[in-house]
Amino acid sequence: MTRLFDLDHAERTAEPLSVRIPLQVARHEAVHEHHGWAFTTWLDPQMAALQAQAIAVALTELAPASEVAFNQRLKELEQRLQQLDRNLEATFATLGHRPVVFSHPVYQYLQARYGINGRSLHWEPEIAPSTRDWIDLQKLLIDHPAALMVWEGEPLADTRKKLADQGIDSVVFEPAGNHPEGGDYYEVMERNRRQLLKA
């Protein structure tokens, strides 16, 4: 038997668990709105904790005899997420209100949680930006003079160099949307945090 649990309406929270943020990216002359919603909720550890609470409630409904074990694991998870949140908050505080460009529109929840002054393009790290892409960047920089670009993966060396020639540093902040090749979510986030501190 398969059951679906709606995490947006968990009884243990007064507010909906996911604040849907439209995907917006700078594209050509105007901001182009992509269809759909931001999905990388786990980039906000506070939201991840709320979702974990909802999952614990759902699991307890399925297996009431395991409630104590579920609650113990939930407590451990919440503590780790709280520590991660504090670490990320301190790291992003070092940016202040410096403008940042995100290479891809997957950082909305991270941006909202930590007050990052960011705008998104739609560049892929493994694909060389087109002439049109570079024009879009120049237009974005007119009113958003960023000196830092955040990538979901390592950009091409030539792309990194061209950005550096324009005074823009590149840093990788993996969204961790898939199981990492090595380590776990927390190790990926710690690696991301260290990369940001170098920027």
Language-model region placement:
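Extracytoplasmic metal-acquisition and chelation regions
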Residues: 1-199
